[in-house]
């Protein structure tokens, strides 16, 4: 899948390692999966891609996914190819993903004082105590100086 790859996220599920990566096969980016028993030797999943750009806001692709396991529900946070928003998809098996109907849940206009007015990219989610934090890169407006932003959300 794709002519090159970018960004990855690895989780351990059912005694296997699942590696999610962005496959760059222009004109559209997609998220693919490779699986390993030992975390060293990976085999591409034959049903790739596991996440495609099928919503209007996703434009020419999806990528840079990061995965969280919350009580057996996998959550993938990903961005669109033009770096204008983030989406979320859920799965119970790591292969079949359901996108939220609230996507994009975060966009460039969601940032404080619009400081990332041009791009938001590379979402990374960390749970600290009872708080879920979304870290991301942002730049703008029109400066192209990468900055790190954070969004806090209390868990239920």
Which residue ranges define each predicted feature?
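Carbohydrate-active catalytic/glycan-binding domains of CAZyme proteins
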Residues: 1-156
């Amino acid at each position: 899948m794709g002519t090159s790859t970018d960004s990855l996220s690895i989780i351990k599920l059912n005694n296997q390692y699942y590696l999610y990566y962005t496959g760059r096969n222009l004109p559209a980016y997609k998220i693919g999966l490779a699986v390993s028993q030992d975390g060293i030797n990976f085999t591409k999943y034959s049903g790739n891609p596991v996440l495609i750009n099928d919503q209007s806001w996703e434009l020419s692709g999806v990528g840079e996914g990061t995965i969280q396991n919350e009580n057996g529900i996998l959550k993938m946070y990903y961005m669109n190819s033009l770096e204008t928003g983030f989406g979320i998809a859920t799965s119970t098996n790591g292969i079949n993903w359901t996108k939220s109907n609230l996507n994009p849940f975060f966009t460039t206009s969601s940032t404080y004082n619009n400081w990332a007015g041009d791009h938001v990219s590379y979402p990374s989610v960390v749970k600290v105590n009872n708080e879920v934090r979304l870290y991301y890169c942002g730049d703008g407006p029109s400066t192209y100086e990468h900055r790190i932003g954070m969004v806090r959300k209390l868990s239920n």
